Amino acid sequence: MKRSIIAGVGAYLPSTVVSNDELAKRVDTSDAWIRERTGIEQRYLATADESCAFMAARAAERALAHAGMTADDVDAILVATSTPDQVFPAVAVRVQALLGAKRGFGFDLSAACSGFVYGLSMGDALIRSGQAKGVLVIGAEVFSRLLDWDDRRTNVLFGDGAGAAFLRASTDNDDPARGILSTHLHSEGEFGDILFIDGANGVAGHPGTIVMNGREVFRHAVGKMAQAVEEAMAANDLTPADIDWLVPHQANLRIIEAMGKKLDLPPEKVVVTVNRHANTSAASIPLALNEAVQDGRIQPGSVVLMEALGGGLTWGSAILRM
């Protein structure tokens, strides 16, 4: 059976960096208040010229270059985002045009902060089914355009950016143990009102801003993500000792640390970027993955575990061997 191999990764972060101290000049907060509650020190915010599609395309170009591939090798483009530039066409087809890709197809998927894990699952399914040989999975967000700048419960948490992974079908020359081992997706709609955007493009004059019950999100996050991680390990007969790296959704340092402890993983096995990137929603996992690959922490053969929870509620996990 064909497996999906992550052949390349890439990322794009906006040109504007905003520290906590700079943010405190705009809203009623402080560096100490933000760090204590979230672990965030700064975030990247998109300029007017840095659209969701632009950032997604830049990340995709870098992932293709890292994989030694070109736009001609792309059969499908999947973009996980909650902040598309327009209702339609999809960000994915805008990316297709920006890359100069002439074949295949693209679509967006909306699973909030779980989006990249959902995208990996869809991309993996396309490759396993034989419908595609090369798939770009991208997480891209411009949450700064949906923030209520008077609500410090949310406006200190989020940042903008994009991360991408190029999946290719395995060949006879590949190590049969390499690739995406399994993905596990969940949702529970009854909790949709604890994290949402209170509007939509279809609501005249009200595109919406983020609304969040932080305590409830925290309460669900650790338990549900741990369940998804344990499910992934059990499906592959693995234990925490077999995991080389945990690449979690970068929402809050306290949640990340709690996840590591719950899984008995030492801090040095957990990739953390939330301090510099803040919460970039669907972009957070691929941004963190890219950093750990590029700096040499994640090597070929590394067993990598990903997990995320987002509005919906949606949550899930993916486990793979690089």
UniProtKB/Swiss-Prot annotation:
Q: Which UniProt keywords apply?
A: Acyltransferase, Cytoplasm, Fatty acid biosynthesis, Fatty acid metabolism, Lipid biosynthesis, Lipid metabolism, Multifunctional enzyme, Transferase
Among the record's GO biological process terms, what is one? secondary metabolite biosynthetic process
* Pathways involved: Lipid metabolism; fatty acid biosynthesis
**Locations listed in the record:** Cytoplasm
**Catalytic activity reported:** malonyl-[ACP] + acetyl-CoA + H(+) = 3-oxobutanoyl-[ACP] + CO2 + CoA
User: Where is the segment annotated ACP-binding?
Assistant: 250-254
Task: Kindly identify the residues recorded as the active site.
Answer: C113, H249, N279
Q: Name one GO cellular component term.
A: cytoplasm
A molecular function (GO) term = beta-ketoacyl-acyl-carrier-protein synthase III activity
Q: Name one Pfam family in it.
A: ACP_syn_III
Entry EC number(s): 2.3.1.180
Q: Where is the signal peptide?
A: none
Task: Tell me the protein family, please.
Answer: Belongs to the thiolase-like superfamily. FabH family.
Q: What does this protein do?
A: Catalyzes the condensation reaction of fatty acid synthesis by the addition to an acyl acceptor of two carbons from malonyl-ACP. Catalyzes the first condensation reaction which initiates fatty acid synthesis and may therefore play a role in governing the total rate of fatty acid production. Possesses both acetoacetyl-ACP synthase and acetyl transacylase activities. Its substrate specificity determines the biosynthesis of branched-chain and/or straight-chain of fatty acids.
Comment field on protein domains: The last Arg residue of the ACP-binding site is essential for the weak association between ACP/AcpP and FabH.
Q: Which HAMAP family match?
A: FabH
Question: What is the protein named?
Answer: Beta-ketoacyl-[acyl-carrier-protein] synthase III
Tell me the classification of the organism that encodes this protein.
Bacteria, Pseudomonadati, Pseudomonadota, Alphaproteobacteria, Acetobacterales
